[in-house]
Amino acid sequence: MVSVFFDVNRASGDIYGINDISPRFLETVKLLKMKSIQVIASLLCGILYCGISLNAQNVLKATGWMPEHTFTSGIEGPAVDSEGNLYAVNYKKEGTIGIVRPDGSHGCFLTLPEGSTGNSIRFGKDGNMYVADYTGHNILKVDMRSKKISVFAHEPKMNQPNDIVFAPNGNIYASDPDWPNQKGQLWLITPDAKVSLLETNMGTTNGIAVSEDGKRLYVNESAQLKVWVYDICPDGTLRNKRLFHTFEGYGMDGMKCDEKGNLYICRYDKGTIALLNPQGDLVEEIQLTGKQPSNLTFGGPDHRQCYVTLQDRGCFETFKAPYPGKEW
């Protein structure tokens, strides 16, 4: 509710707002009909209310952005480079990476080596692209100038990997689900490509994100509908695991943080993006047109444009987030 009080300049007849009721206000009431003031106040309040409502709808309403089935149903792992280009895996066929330029044009950026299929893309501080290759059990590195692809890290004991995220110091964390058995693992890959198993016997680890300050790691378990949070130690190991949020119904997939510490989570088959605040409370569910969001990323000039990959539509949807995204 918005409360508005008014006063009148006797010389000019102009009406202006005041913060509290004063004797002058009572005198003013004698000069003007209260009905006129109520009409003006109602109009101003209505304009203010509509402005707030329209702004909220613009922030939290997703829209289509490109033709359906531009990518395959395996579209995943979106990421934006320093020039504003948007990337995702499986452009028109499996084993590729597609590029969507700021002007909306799109095409195949590169084809991965035979036997490799990407599932997640991130950009390192070196400007190069890193790809979770779930069929090859690799983290691939792509030189963005030459498009040369190399194996940055390989671990045959990985089930996949599925999703990856950078910490501020260059460490990579990887989720590693075992879908048939509904189990999962967490891995750490250091800047010198050393691979370490952090935790096993988890649920189906899927989406993974680092907090805005780089001090916490979030991991969700799709089948178990749980989101966990860890404290990140200086050496990259994890401690103080605790339950952050539990959902009811529908699965989860990729997720990202914004600069205020809010967490955006893809609700697979529900067709929404769940927005959790830093305390783990569900603040909003952003409705999408498609039903199978697989991941999301932030981009645009102000880093508030959120791009969501939709597997049932084979394309992106987009919405304006309240705050800029945080990427490492």
Would you name each region that the model predicts?
Residues C108-T111, S150-H154, L197-T200, R239-H245, ...:
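Beta-propeller fold detector
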Residues M1-V8, D14-N58:
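Bacterial Sec-dependent N-terminal signal peptides
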Residues A88-H106:
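Beta-propeller domains
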Residues T96-G98, N138-L140, Q185-W187, K226-W228, ...:
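A short loop-to-beta-strand structural motif that recurs across blades of beta-propeller domains
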Residues V100-S105, D143-K147, I189-A193, I232-D235, ...:
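Short loop/turn segments that connect beta-strands within beta-propeller blades
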Residues I232-N295:
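Glycine/small-residue-rich hydrophobic helix-like segments
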Residues Q57-F71, K241:
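A short helix->beta-strand "capping" segment at the edge of beta-propeller domains
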Residues H69-L86, P113-D133, N138, E155-K183, ...:
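Beta-rich, blade/repeat-based domains predominating
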